[in-house]
């Protein structure tokens, strides 16, 4: 089946489009969606076959965790086993926004989502489409970049079609995201922290937040 491209407004996402996309996610399918950085692949993180579908679409090694998108700090905390103080400090400063926090995952999440590491990468994106989709699905969704593993991230739907072709049933097309930098990824271990990937938020800004 050819992939379906459906227009959506990033400023005022149409409810019927969001509900339509949510139906795919609830059925265990993988949908391409715009975020505040690049396009992502949205699936139900609690559905093992959906998770396998994301890995398959990307050609991603299963040793790599899949980032999870949430709609609030409270929702993120339901996925965290132990919450370091630095988690709330960073989340309350930069969320919603381009910061991904890697922490110990609750046992509620399938181990495969964590890349068999037991750790989960969480982000609250500053995106109305993502926010409305999470509400419509009724819980967190995956947010890994919508590209082939090792290829450039996609800032528009056309690039996803080029890379992933018919591996997806649906892409929500909100035009160009304007993304130039991916989210910054910070790993938290108790009182220890380190920047795993510098992105839209510089390292020194993270340092200042945690050492003010």
Model-found features: residue ranges?
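Active-site-adjacent structural elements in enzyme catalytic cores
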Residues: 1-212
């Amino acid at each position: 089946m050819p992939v379906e491209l459906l227009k959506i407004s990033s400023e005022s996402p149409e409810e019927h489009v969001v509900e339509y996309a949510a139906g795919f996610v609830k059925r265990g399918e993988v949908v391409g969606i715009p975020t505040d950085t690049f396009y992502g692949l949205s699936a139900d993180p609690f559905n093992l076959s959906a998770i396998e579908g994301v890995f398959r679409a990307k050609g991603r090694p299963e040793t790599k965790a899949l980032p999870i998108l949430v709609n609030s700090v409270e929702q993120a905390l339901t996925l965290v086993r132990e919450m370091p103080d630095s988690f709330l400090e960073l989340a309350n400063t930069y969320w919603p926004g381009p910061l991904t926090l890697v922490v110990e995952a609750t046992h509620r999440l399938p181990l495969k989502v964590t890349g068999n590491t037991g750790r989960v990468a969480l982000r609250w994106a500053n995106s109305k489409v993502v926010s409305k989709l999470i509400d419509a699905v009724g819980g967190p969704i995956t947010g890994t970049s919508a590209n082939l593993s090792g290829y450039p991230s996609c800032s528009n739907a056309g690039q996803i079609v080029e890379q992933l072709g018919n591996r997806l049933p649906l892409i929500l097309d909100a035009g160009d995201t304007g993304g130039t930098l991916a989210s910054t990824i910070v790993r938290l271990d108790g009182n220890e922290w380190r920047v795993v990937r510098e992105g839209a938020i510089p390292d020194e800004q993270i340092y200042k937040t945690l050492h003010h």
